[in-house]
Amino acid sequence: MDEDVLTTLKILIIGESGVGKSSLLLRFTDDTFDPELAATIGVDFKVKTISVDGNKAKLAIWDTAGQERFRTLTPSYYRGAQGVILVYDVTRRDTFVKLDNWLNELETYCTRNDIVNMLVGNKIDKENREVDRNEGLKFARKHSMLFIEASAKTCDGVQCAFEELVEKIIQTPGLWESENQNKGVKLSHREESRGGGACGGYCSVL
């Protein structure tokens, strides 16, 4: 690991098929958007290093297929994850209703009890909304999750989602400090004195 990188974090993106998980990932890592992007087969994987409040973190981001036939990949996919982005489509209520199923899966297979979860309502650029923002916020509060609405197409909220998730993980040293205890790394003073969220009105730390 690079000396100036605080830690490497495993981040998962989960949710029903077609909610835009891969599009969010590609917008964040490559700043691209493909409206004809094919459904993920199995698991996709990308790496990106970001800086949050003076601390560099290398993100290993896992994007999984939402289809039921790929669920045999689940146990290894969740193992060792420090953060999860749970995505639904604000124009498809069925993807919101099924969030409980994904949370149950997360609780079943996740190996950490202090993992940081972020709920993302994607596709806010579309007009045919079926899930109100307050519904998403209420669900996130109920399950102690971070929350944001976003659009992979317009880039709205995408960077914020990942940065807020990483910030919260870094503020939870138990998630990563054991991996770095022999490297002498520590948080920057900016992070130690960190107050509110970096994304203004977008994210709610709950």
Swiss-Prot record:
It is an enzyme of class 3 (hydrolase). CDD domains: Rab18. Its EC number is 3.6.5.2. Expression is high in the brain, moderate in the pituitary, and low in the liver. Detected in all tissues. Highly enriched on apical endocytic structures in polarized epithelial cells of kidney proximal tubules. Detected on both the apical and basolateral domains in epithelial cells of the intestine. It holds the Pfam family Ras. InterPro entries: P-loop_NTPase, Rab, Sigma_54_int_dom_ATP-bd_1, Small_GTP-bd, Small_GTPase. Residues 204-206 form a propeptide. A motif (Switch 1) lies at residues 31-45. A lipid is attached at C199 (S-palmitoyl cysteine). The modification Cysteine methyl ester is found at C203. A motif (Switch 2) lies at residues 63-80. One of its GO terms (molecular function) is GTPase activity. GO terms for biological process: brain development; eye development; import into nucleus; lipid droplet organization; protein transport. A lipid is attached at C203 (S-geranylgeranyl cysteine). Keywords: Acetylation, Cell membrane, Developmental protein, Endoplasmic reticulum, Golgi apparatus, GTP-binding, Hydrolase, Lipid droplet, Lipoprotein, Magnesium, Membrane, Metal-binding, Methylation, Nucleotide-binding, Palmitate, Phosphoprotein, Prenylation, Protein transport, Transport. It is found in: Endoplasmic reticulum membrane; Golgi apparatus, cis-Golgi network membrane; Lipid droplet; Apical cell membrane. It catalyses: GTP + H2O = GDP + phosphate + H(+). The modification Phosphoserine is found at S144. Belongs to the small GTPase superfamily. Rab family. This is Ras-related protein Rab-18. It comes from Mus musculus.
